[in-house]
Structure formats: C-alpha cells, structure tokens
UniProtKB/Swiss-Prot annotation:
Keywords: Cytoplasm, RNA-binding. The gene is smpB. Disulfide bonds: none annotated. Belongs to the SmpB family. The keyword Metal-binding does not apply. The keyword Cytoplasm applies. Required for rescue of stalled ribosomes mediated by trans-translation. Binds to transfer-messenger RNA (tmRNA), required for stable association of tmRNA with ribosomes. tmRNA and SmpB together mimic tRNA shape, replacing the anticodon stem-loop with SmpB. tmRNA is encoded by the ssrA gene; the 2 termini fold to resemble tRNA(Ala) and it encodes a 'tag peptide', a short internal open reading frame. During trans-translation Ala-aminoacylated tmRNA acts like a tRNA, entering the A-site of stalled ribosomes, displacing the stalled mRNA. This is SsrA-binding protein. One of its GO terms (molecular function) is RNA binding. Residues 141-165 are annotated as: Disordered. PROSITE patterns: SSRP. Residues 145-159 have a biased composition (Basic and acidic residues).
Length: 165
C-alpha cells in the first residue's frame, strides 16, 4: 500500500510549520531596511509557549553586538499564563541570537557606518524552530516618510486606474 497521503493535508501542515508569530510593522515605516538576516533565538520553555500563543511585542526592540555575540534587547515576551511565578521568565530579559561568525562580522562592519541599526522585523516558525528575522536599517526622517507615503499613494492610484480599464 502506497504512503502518498493527502496532498492538501501536507500543504496545510507546511503552512502551519512556517507561520508568522509576531511582526514589527512599525520598523518598516521608521527605517529603510537595507539587509535582512534570519537568526535563531535562545529561549526558555515559558518564552516558547508565550511566543506560540502570540504574546510577543517586537516594537521597541533592537539588537547589539557585544563580546562577539548578537543580543536582542527590549523585546517584551509576556509571562506564560499557566506557569507559576517561580518558573516564569523575565519579560524584558536580554536574549542571545544565534548566527554564524561570518554573518556577525559582516553586520559589525556594516554597523560601523554612521546611522545604521539592527532591528527585529518578525518572529516566525520554521519547522519546529522559532526564528527571528533582523534587519539592518537606516532611520527615516519625517520628509522621507512623507515621500514614501506619496509614492505608495501614487502606486495605488495607478493600480486602481489599470484595474478599471
């Protein structure tokens, strides 16, 4: 007997295995993202449960390179609701990010340029692993944000005009 299985079920399983857990939409507005990198993140058990429940906030987060390690700061992961206070984690603790040495060295070289920063963009599942996508961003000024908004509005108008014809 063949073990083909249901193709719809396998596609659904793949989609569930690669789902978005938290997104930092404000970062894409405040920064021009020049480069992205997918990293692992060192978590404790209650943090994993909270992230899978969708209780992570990346909005105020940033990354630093200290002692040759990537560190994630100021990301709030709510304490797990079913764990006691003794076993729970600190919501704002510094978390270590897992990346290859050459990737960290490349980021360090780029960060030495003026005005660049590392910001968390999203948390997602890749198989059973929780991954963090970080971005190398350059802060936008107010006039840059306005120009970007005007460009997006013009693109929307062109798209709607083409759809009408």
């Amino acid at each position: 007997m063949a073990k083909g299985g249901n193709k719809k079920a396998t596609a659904a399983a793949r989609a569930a295995a690669n789902r978005l857990l938290a997104d930092n939409r404000l970062a894409r507005h405040q920064y021009e993202i020049l480069d992205t990198l997918e990293t692992g993140i060192e978590l404790v058990g209650t943090e994993v449960k909270s992230i899978r429940a969708g209780q992570a906030n990346l909005r105020d987060g940033f990354c630093l390179i200290r002692k040759g390690e990537l560190q994630l700061h100021n990301v709030h992961i709510s304490p797990h609701s079913h764990a006691g206070s003794y076993f729970n984690h600190d919501p704002l603790r510094t978390r270590k990010l897992l990346a290859h040495r050459r990737e960290i060295d490349k980021l360090r070289g780029q960060l030495d340029r003026k005005g660049l920063t590392l910001i968390p963009l999203n948390l997602h599942l890749k198989g059973s692993w929780i991954k963090l996508t970080i971005g190398l961003g350059k802060g936008r000024k107010l006039h840059d944000k306005r120009q970007e908004e005007k460009r997006k509005q013009a693109d929307r108008e062109v798209k709607s005009a083409l759809a009408r014809y």
